[in-house]
Amino acid sequence: MAGPAWRDAADVVVIGTGVAGLAAALAADRAGRSVVVLSKAAQTHVTATHYAQGGIAVVLPDNDDSVDAHVADTLAAGAGLCDPDAVYSIVADGYRAVTDLVGAGARLDESVPGRWALTREGGHSRRRIVHAGGDATGAEVQRALQDAAGMLDIRTGHVALRVLHDGTAVTGLLVVRPDGCGIISAPSVILATGGLGHLYSATTNPAGSTGDGIALGLWAGVAVSDLEFIQFHPTMLFAGRAGGRRPLITEAIRGEGAILVDRQGNSITAGVHPMGDLAPRDVVAAAIDARLKATGDPCVYLDARGIEGFASRFPTVTASCRAAGIDPVRQPIPVVPGAHYSCGGIVTDVYGQTELLGLYAAGEVARTGLHGANRLASNSLLEGLVVGGRAGKAAAAHAAAAGRSRATSSATWPEPISYTALDRGDLQRAMSRDASMYRAAAGLHRLCDSLSGAQVRDVACRRDFEDVALTLVAQSVTAAALARTESRGCHHRAEYPCTVPEQARSIVVRGADDANAVCVQALVAVC
């Protein structure tokens, strides 16, 4: 590369336009900093936030609930790997964050005028889930934040290729857009890139969930943790061998009384957990997987026929089912577990700060300590609002202290971008076969062999970068899964079916000297 095709500068650059990214950008803007928001997509609303159905877990001051109860439910779901202080900090700030969201224009469903309606989801001991549009909470959150961010500098079709730094602090970003590669100089960068669901052949995630932020963090030298804990949502709409993004069937349906049964009508979770169909997601998904293995059936069923007014309460699910030829009012809904959420990510504090000065992460890409080994339902939008807003404030404060001139002079043109990448279809098939809900040493080693066949590719566009990111993140997930020789939360090892108390520590992955490889620091405390 002879040099950048273009240059730009800002105080804060945010990568991502979901709940965490927009919350961060708005907070940084309110702090008086210049903000640039990047989206690799052509449309900014195509995010995991937009597709979120269930709601936001929040303790209301006038409800029969408490922050301590929400914290306890979160810790129980997290299977011993949550950071209790982080959990309390984020949960306790939830009501303030949701109130601010409503103040920005979000319209939540109400049980009576002036009182938010509440539902219950798996792992929660109380009805504490606020929602919008029945089962379109994410779409309403996305709409409200985008409307509020209408005056911000949001740029579509921009793919962040590398976080630039001087070894001590962030200096900017290398970005590719239709007119070529360029540099945005900035002292603060916030990664809010979402998840990694497209490691697998079928997922509830949108097309952009390709692990970009994890790869950017690894290349920047910061710690990534808990990547072996990939949550498979118990109820993804079954559609035969169809891959790509598949519709989610929200957990709130079970909260309103729907039951999970097999083809013979037998309960899936009876005798498995005291909370039955409302057990934490890892428990319910594992119970479904076990039943499918025992019966040889391709799916189980969510029977929601007893829910009065189903179509009006769950319009999104109703539309998805009817598009697939299923009437959920009259027929049980065929479901299977599907890749849904990364409980791990870039290690940050509860303000989104990473090890690298000026680099922040928020939302699904981050590991704050809230989720541990298994995320509690509807804690994701909560975390995005709370930590996204905090990260924006922190990034703005750092930018004010660092000053623009240092970042501008430090951001230099890098060498050509070339990494190794596996064919995406081959990678997804290998991950679905060997690193899905259940893992075994033989399969994980076979997966390592498959990943070692990745070929060098010059990164010149979004597709190239996504394939490179998926390959590096697949290596990271595989390495972490091999290192954890127990079953805990979302991570199940066939030859190690028990939870080992001595392994109640996080596994940290870092980028190796070779940018196409990773190394593992096994079982270290990162809380």
Curated annotation (Swiss-Prot):
Protein keywords: Cytoplasm, FAD, Flavoprotein, Nucleotide-binding, Oxidoreductase, Pyridine nucleotide biosynthesis
SUPFAM superfamilies referenced in this protein's UniProt entry, alphabetically: FAD/NAD(P)-binding domain (SSF51905), Succinate dehydrogenase/fumarate reductase flavoprotein C-terminal domain (SSF46977), Succinate dehydrogenase/fumarate reductase flavoprotein, catalytic domain (SSF56425)
Q: Which reaction is recorded as catalysed by this protein?
A: L-aspartate + O2 = iminosuccinate + H2O2
**Positions that bind FAD:** 17-20, 40, 48-55, 212, 364, 380-381
Under the heading InterPro entries, the entry gives: FAD-dep_OxRdtase_2_FAD-bd, FAD/NAD-bd_sf, Fum_R/Succ_DH_flav-like_C_sf, Fum_Rdtase/Succ_DH_flav-like_C, NadB, Succ_DH/fumarate_Rdtase_cat_sf
Which Gene3D superfamilies does its entry note?
A: FAD/NAD(P)-binding domain, Fumarate reductase/succinate dehydrogenase flavoprotein-like, C-terminal domain, Succinate dehydrogenase/fumarate reductase flavoprotein, catalytic domain
The EC number(s) attached to this protein equal: 1.4.3.16
The free-text function statement in the UniProt record for this protein reads:
Catalyzes the oxidation of L-aspartate to iminoaspartate, the first step in the de novo biosynthesis of NAD(+).
Q: What is this protein called?
A: L-aspartate oxidase
Q: Which organism is it from?
A: Mycobacterium bovis (strain ATCC BAA-935 / AF2122/97)
